[in-house]
Amino acid sequence: MSNKNLLSGRDKELQELAEQYEAAMAENKPFYQDADELADLADWYGTKKRYDKAFEIAEYGLKLHPDSTELMIEYAYLHLDNGKQAKAREIIENLPDTYSPEAKVVRAHLLLSEGKLDDAEQLLDTIEDKDDLANVVDVSYMYLDMGYPDKALAWLDPVKEEYSDEEAYIAVVADCLYGKGMTEEAIPLYNRLIDMNPYSAPYWFGLAR
């Protein structure tokens, strides 16, 4: 699970999609979306700690799109978030695409949950485009979620000049600094994020912490 869905505009879109999904289920109506939309929706429910709904939408999505790497990865993350490493491993080992950056990040998450830091780092080092913002953000949030903010910053620092004005970059750096206890350094970044997206509850929460 990543925090990409909390960025400006996307959280609201997914809130609306969740309302549509729940209304359709309540009325026993079909609800069709692309695999990536359903994966994002499952992730959105997960970030809200609504895991029953998150699992429900992931499993519903996999019935519609059984070969979707995106949905399988999200399904694996949900199991990892709930301490079900064995099931997560089974899903990860059966991913249709094991070489994508997203597949490597979720496998690294599993390795870290098993205490295999060196193996996780070696795997992440095989990601080809380490300067791609999406890859940097995914890896950084994974490290941060697993309690390694310094490892996250090691991925963030090399691309600082290129992405220092990007909302996604600023958000993960702010969260990493907060994770290291560097609250004073994080506050100006949360203020920048609020200027970019004044209606984002996570940014206000970050500032209030």
Where are the regions that the model predicts?
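Short coil turns that delineate tetratricopeptide repeat
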Residues: 66, 98-100, 130-132, 163-164, ...
